């Protein structure tokens, strides 16, 4: 009987030794699972660019205003039909946005005065003007991730000033009326830190102005359609 018990004990010891590696493997799997879970929680806890209800963002950047290629024709003027061409210009810009909800904000755009050359096709430069284009937009921001696109629609008011004449109309008084129009806005915020992001954006603005020379309507059709594309970059920080 003793040899039989000895063999049984030996088998029990052998089975116990086989079970130990399996137990070790189970512990390793559990530890790995805990590590993966901890990493996932840490990633989820990484702060997103703070754009939530009640917060403000301010953006400082530079934008180029590029009027559309065909700005309209002034018809039946003393100089005949004049096809207008308004030049591009880039200036520093600033935006301020207040978030009504986590994804919805109201933004105001301001800038240093833009200056544009005014050309008549076939004649050349006939003047220049400056304008300010304050724009108020309602904007929707998608998601809460590192890359956050947005869209917006708003109203633009453009005022023209410091208009000068030269060339064939030098010495005359050229007047450009102020303009109200719709504005569309799309862009993407790329998070850099909890409080900062790099923004790339594009706007299209409806700007139409009526032209007068020495106080008189210039031609039978005196509207110049500027309708620019506005694109640029900005650094946006929240508080």
Regions found by a protein language model. Name each.
Residues 1-29:
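Short, Lys/Arg-enriched N-terminal segments with co-localized hydrophobic residues
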Residues 50-55, 103, 143-148, 192-195:
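Short loop/turn motifs that connect adjacent beta-strands in outer-membrane beta-barrel proteins
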Residues 64-68, 95-167, 226-239:
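Gram-negative (and chloroplast) outer-membrane scaffold detector with strong preference
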Residues 78-82, 119-127, 168-174, 217-223:
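Extracellular loop and loop/strand-boundary signature of outer-membrane beta-barrel proteins
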Residues 115, 193-239:
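Predominantly the C-terminal beta-signal and adjacent terminal strand-loop region
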């Amino acid at each position: 009987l003793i040899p039989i018990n000895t063999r049984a004990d030996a088998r029990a010891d052998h089975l116990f030794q086989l079970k130990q590696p399996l137990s070790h493997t189970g512990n390793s799997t559990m530890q790995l699972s805990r590590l993966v879970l901890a990493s996932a929680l840490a990633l989820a806890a990484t702060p997103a660019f703070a754009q939530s209800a009640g917060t403000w963002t301010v953006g400082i950047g530079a934008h180029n205003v590029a009027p559309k290629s065909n700005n309209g024709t002034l018809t039946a003027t003393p100089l005949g039909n004049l096809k207008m061409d308004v030049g591009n210009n880039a200036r520093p810009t600033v935006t301020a946005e207040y978030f009504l909800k986590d994804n919805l904000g109201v933004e105001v755009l301001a800038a240093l005065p833009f200056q544009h050359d005014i050309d008549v096709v076939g004649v050349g430069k006939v003047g220049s003007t400056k304008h300010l284009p304050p724009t108020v937009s309602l904007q929707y921001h998608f998601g809460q991730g590192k890359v956050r696109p947005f869209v917006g629609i708003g109203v633009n008011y453009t005022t023209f000033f410091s208009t000068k004449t030269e060339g064939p109309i030098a010495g005359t008084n050229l007047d450009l009326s102020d303009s109200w129009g719709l504005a569309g806005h799309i862009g993407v915020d790329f998070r850099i830190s909890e409080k900062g992001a790099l923004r790339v954006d594009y706007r299209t603005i409806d700007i139409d102005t009526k032209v007068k020379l020495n106080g008189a309507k210039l031609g039978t059709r005196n509207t110049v359609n500027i309708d620019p594309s506005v694109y640029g970059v900005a650094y946006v920080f929240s508080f």
